[in-house]
Amino acid sequence: METKKTLREGYTTGSCAAAATKAALTALITGQVQTDATIRLPIGRVVTFSLASCSFEGETATAAVVKDGGDDPDATHGALIVSTVSWASSPGVHIDGGEGVGRVTKPGLPVPVGEAAINPVPRQMIREAVNEVLAQYGLHRGVKVVISVPGGEEIAKKTLNPRLGIMGGISILGTRGIVVPFSTAAYRASIVQALQVAKANGCRHVVITTGGRSEKYAMQEYPHLPEEAFIEMGDFVGFTLKQCKRLGIKMVSMVGMMGKFSKVAQGVMMVHSKSAPVDFGFLAALAEQAGASSALVAAVRGANTAAQVGDMMQEAGCTKFFELLCEACCRAALNEVGGGLTVATSIYTMNGQRLGKAVQIDGDDETDRRGS
């Protein structure tokens, strides 16, 4: 029997930055090139990082660590995280971002506008690394730390940073110090952050989508909304709706396709392909309610995919089916959060044709079958 492979954990950009900082400061103090650095992660684990480089000249030292994302490589996997350390004229640890580290331009993030996108936990890890080395050598001096990521501006284009208003590079992130492979917690955290930015920038109406293609169609449907109002929720429909309500967002538009929204209509709020199968009996009942012929209802019941059902109903000109499906999605969403929101649902084909739309405002249904 084949044994299941254990996925290898990686380390966050914050952990890499802290390790590089410790090595650079040690080199600055001792005048010796370092080959590795050992730090304690926020979860309590002690880890030794090998250095990609270490050098010093005069009152400055630099060390670098290659980011290893483990078996869940993200856009920053393989990036060089560089720390340049020098003595500061004032006491304390002064942290800033250099080349390839983004700068915050919009409110709603854990870091104030104008500062380098180095999140609070990595900042604390860097401070702890500096203080540990200073204590080891009995020194009481101010230290300046600049974190940089060569090529970080290009890497950032593959992340949510431009949407979040983090310009010029990547963020230095991490709350636990490790990257758990395919962690749902990381994706949920990105949803919350995107919603917080939307709210902080005055968005009272957000559009949540199941993926990049759905988001493209959503932007065409709601061209008047700013970019930060559009949030990819992936499979986390229920979680995203609850976060919208928690943050006081009043209008939520859901945009997606037949496969996932056929599940949402039944109250399935985690719509991964493995989480719940499409219920073709439910879709057949909707088709019957929409006035489909008995032969078409039977065909729906025996279909292989929800997209196939959509094609069948579209070819038959049964637009009422899509109205009913969108209405069911709105009701399920409101039921999930206990009301208090206005919810719209739009369902699209893979090619970007809108099949139907419904809006539920405090218990009232409005339906718009076609067009924009």
Swiss-Prot record:
Broadest EC class assigned to this enzyme: transferase
Nucleus recorded as keyword: no
Membrane-crossing segments per the record: none
InterPro entries: CbiD, CbiD_sf
Recorded metabolic or biological pathway in which this protein acts: Cofactor biosynthesis; adenosylcobalamin biosynthesis; cob(II)yrinate a,c-diamide from sirohydrochlorin (anaerobic route): step 6/10
Keywords annotated in UniProt: Cobalamin biosynthesis, Methyltransferase, S-adenosyl-L-methionine, Transferase
Catalytic activity, EC: 2.1.1.195
A molecular-function term among this protein's GO annotations: cobalt-precorrin-5B C1-methyltransferase activity
Source organism, top-level taxon: Bacteria
One GO-annotated biological process of the protein: methylation
Catalysis: reaction(s): Co-precorrin-5B + S-adenosyl-L-methionine = Co-precorrin-6A + S-adenosyl-L-homocysteine
Family (UniProt): Belongs to the CbiD family.
HAMAP family tied to this protein: CbiD (MF_00787)
NCBIfam families reported for this sequence: cbiD, PRK00075.1-1
PANTHER family from the UniProt entry: COBALT-PRECORRIN-5B C(1)-METHYLTRANSFERASE
Protein name: Cobalt-precorrin-5B C(1)-methyltransferase
Record lineage: Bacteria, Bacillati, Bacillota, Bacilli, Bacillales
Gene: cbiD
